[in-house]
């Protein structure tokens, strides 16, 4: 496993150089949807990451936001070792010069995350995890918060890029109900960094429904779990990497948080 995480870190840092180089420059922007953006940096980073990983692990499978999945509109997650990559999570932040952007690289074996690497090159924060061996921020062990009162919890969520009225109404309605039960709410614009925020205790809770795909959570979910947290479906059922639904919490807040989310449905 050490070889896997070392190679993933190398790839993330190389992609991070591209992101850092382009962060303060003008960008060529394309639209995947009305507000769903992609830049030449997203594409260049994914090519770099996949080339680096394929050189080291040619027999592995690969799923990426910008090429593998976006080109066909679907993907297949098998039991084979599979690298799941978001080359630039937080593209809208990148376009606006808002420094919550990251490279997210996860490895699954038998459909379970076993390696997670999330790197924010703008503030030089590297989150890593190997299954069963803990989670780390820049090499130092991290743990989820010990907060036990929902009313004191800081929660993160996102509104996503889907502008279908029914989905937007459901999202905002959920926020309107949850906000009265917690201390405050944040939206960073990056699913992967929200998960890492829970892992290191900056955030107590995170949930998101209808995010882009497994590339948003493959690395971050493992990092939360290895930091002592729980990753679930917002309904309280088992987390499904491919379902585009996630909730992250510590053990103390789990029941109250899941109840609050279910009451909001």
UniProtKB/Swiss-Prot annotation:
EC number: 3.1.3.25
Residues annotated as binding Mg(2+) 2: 86, 89, 216
Catalytic activity: a myo-inositol phosphate + H2O = myo-inositol + phosphate
One record GO biological process: inositol metabolic process
Residues that coordinate or bind substrate: 65, 88-91, 189-191, 208, 216
Annotated InterPro entries: IMPase, Inositol_monoP_metal-BS, Inositol_monoPase_Li-sen, Inositol_monophosphatase-like, Inositol_monophosphatase_CS
Name of this protein: Inositol monophosphatase 2
Gene name per UniProt: IMP2
């Amino acid at each position: 496993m050490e070889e896997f995480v070392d190679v993933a870190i190398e790839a993330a840092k190389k992609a991070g150089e591209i992101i850092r180089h382009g962060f303060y420059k003008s960008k060529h922007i394309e639209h995947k949807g009305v507000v769903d953006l992609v830049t030449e940096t997203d594409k260049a980073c994914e090519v770099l990451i996949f080339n680096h990983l394929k050189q080291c692990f040619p027999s592995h499978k690969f799923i990426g936001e910008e090429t593998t999945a976006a080109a066909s509109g679907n993907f297949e997650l098998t039991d084979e070792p599979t690298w799941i990559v978001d080359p630039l999570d937080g593209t809208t932040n990148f376009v606006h010069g808002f420094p919550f952007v990251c490279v997210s690289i996860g490895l699954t074996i038998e459909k379970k995350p076993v390696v997670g690497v999330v790197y924010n090159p703008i503030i030089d924060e590297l989150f890593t995890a190997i299954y069963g061996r803990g989670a780390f921020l820049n090499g130092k062990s991290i743990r989820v918060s010990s907060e036990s009162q929902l009313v004191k919890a800081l929660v993160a969520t996102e509104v996503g890029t889907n502008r279908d009225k029914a989905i937007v109404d459901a999202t905002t309605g959920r926020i309107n109900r949850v906000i009265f039960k917690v201390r405050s709410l944040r939206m960073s614009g990056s699913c992967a960094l929200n998960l890492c925020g829970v892992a290191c205790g900056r955030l107590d809770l995170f949930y998101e429904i209808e995010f882009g795909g497994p590339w948003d959570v493959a690395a971050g979910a493992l990092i939360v779990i290895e930091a002592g947290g729980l990753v679930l479906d917002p309904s309280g059922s088992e987390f499904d990497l491919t379902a585009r639904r996630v909730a992250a919490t510590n053990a103390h807040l789990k029941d109250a948080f899941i109840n609050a989310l279910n009451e909001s449905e």
